[in-house]
Structure formats: C-alpha cells, structure tokens
C-alpha cells in the first residue's frame, strides 16, 4: 500500500483574502536514515516563521492507495485512519467532528467520515474501489511540533512530504502587516537564548588547600574536646563507685 503525507499551508493576507504562496518541498528521504529525524528536520523550518502574521495552521494530508476492499483490509484501514485523525485538531480529535476523505478514481467521490462521541467512525464507501483516498487534518503548528505521538505517526508513512512556504513571500506580507493596523498572530514562540555565565577567574590549587585545612581543623578540635570531657566525667564516677563498694564491704 502506497501512502504519503503532504501538507498545505492556508494563509490570509492583511485584507483577509486567502493567499497560496509558492511552496517548496521537504521530502522525507533527505538522506537521513531515520524518517522521524527527517520529519523533525522539516518542522524546524516552521520555527523560523514566528514573525509571520497569521501563520498558525498546517494541513497535513494522508494519501492512501485503496485496493478492492476486503473485510480484513477495511479493519486495518479503519485503525490506521483513526490513528492519524485522532491526532488532528487542537483537541486531538477530528476537526469539527468530521474529516472529508476524497476518493479519486474514474469518478471523484467524497467519503465522509463522521466521529460520534463514543468514538465510532462511520464510512460512506460509495465509489471507493481502486481509488486513492486523501484524509486532510488540521494541526496547530506549535502543538504539532510538541506532539511526539503525531510526529511518530507521520514518520511511519513510507513516502511523505511536508511543504513549507517561501520565506521571501512571507516577509513581504509581514512588512505589509507591520505598516497596517493588523495584529500578527504568532503561534510559535522561540525561547530566548540562555544568558551567558560570567567568566570567573580560576582559583589556584594552593588556595583551595588552605581553605580545606581551615575548615577541617576546628572539626577535629571539637571531636577531641568532646572525648576529653567524656574522659573527665567518667573518672570521678568510677572513684565514687569504688568508695561506696569499700564502705559496704567494711
């Protein structure tokens, strides 16, 4: 079964019109052995868009080639579709309770997958044979980057692609937004770099020796003084006991 994951960037400009900027592709292969590393490599690109207005959501599309379905295969597909779609959206469920799955064959068909409160998923399998099914789910980029379960699910796909927009096109939109009354919506906050630690002069080894000796000597003296006090207190007690015994014997 051939499968792939792609993404579509939905962006609106300052006037509210929907914009489709030129896209460049970040393939899952990338010469990296681990596909999960490749997925994180692609999402690193998104972190650089924190100054871009309205850059909030990414739409990941899972494409599955569907052979003539048998009951066994439908159960596998059902489970796999659930694993992908339950990671979608801000609450981790299907976006708005529904996911549109479009099957492309000789005739274009829409298969509606609706999720009930008990987790049951219903399919409309009309015109589903020998088609390619595409499931589109909406992710919040910041939450997707922090969601390791979603990243693992994306990395399981054999041939997936993550698209990200041309930075130059977005910078122009960002400059236009700064000159208007539009408030940029920032979904990814990059943490500030850690403050540099002040350089401390190295302390010579001889000074360390002196300091340790200073703190060790009083401790030894305290222990010795305690021993001496115990010895002094034991001697008169023994002498008194001896005197009492002698008097009793006499």
Swiss-Prot record:
Belongs to the ascovirus HvAV ORF18 family. It comes from Spodoptera frugiperda ascovirus 1a (SfAV-1a). Coiled coil: none annotated. The lineage of its organism: Viruses, Varidnaviria, Bamfordvirae, Nucleocytoviricota, Megaviricetes. GO terms for cellular component: membrane. This is Uncharacterized protein ORF12. Residues 182-205 are annotated as: Disordered. It is a single-pass membrane protein. The chain crosses the membrane at residues 230-250. It is found in: Membrane. The keyword GTP-binding does not apply. Residues 190-201 have a biased composition (Pro residues). Keywords: Membrane, Transmembrane, Transmembrane helix.
